[in-house]
Amino acid sequence: MKKFLVIAMVALGSALFTNVNAQEIADNALGLRIGGNDGFGPEISYQRAVGSNNNRLEFDLGWRNHKHYDIVKLVGLYQWVWNIEGGFNWFVGAGAGIANLDDDRFEPYYNDGAYLLLAGDIGIEYNFDIPLVLSLDLRPELGFHDDYGAIDDFSPDFAIGLRYQF
């Protein structure tokens, strides 16, 4: 009976330890996030783990191109990450950002300027055995600007990301 209890404890401890390791996220990740809402474009993306509960900060600096305007934006998010199984994780987050709009539709009344935005985030990611992570996410954004119809106040931003973990 003692042998059975010892073996059961070792097996349970090994399973728990393996599960904890599978859930750990990298301290840092740097790469590209490519997607679009009001236009299509790339973002340079940096993630930094914070705390010990698989939470992280994500900062994205990017450019969106549309036939009538361009947007450069910086978004910061706080994300909570949960393991699904093995290398698969899912995450949710919330944050804010600032953007600059260059609108060339209505000359001479261009609607250029900066605006603030709030953002949410939900997605799924896969951590490969090599230090790469591939992600797919939806980031709904709510912009606070006087837009004269250039862009919507609400924009769902779908994107795919590839980041190097270190």
Name each model-derived stretch.
Residues 1-4:
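Positively charged n-region of N-terminal signal peptides that target proteins for export
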Residues 47-136, 164:
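Gram-negative (and chloroplast) outer-membrane scaffold detector with strong preference
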Residues 27-28, 59, 105-106, 142-144:
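Extracytoplasmic loops and strand-loop junctions of Gram-negative outer membrane beta-barrel proteins
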Residues 69, 129-166:
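Predominantly the C-terminal beta-signal and adjacent terminal strand-loop region
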Residues 7-15:
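Bacterial N-terminal signal peptides
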Residues 26-28, 38-42, 70-74, 88, ...:
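Residues that define the transmembrane beta-barrel architecture of outer-membrane proteins
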Residues 26-56, 61:
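Start-of-domain marker
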Residues 16-23:
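Sec/Tat signal peptide C-region and signal peptidase I cleavage site
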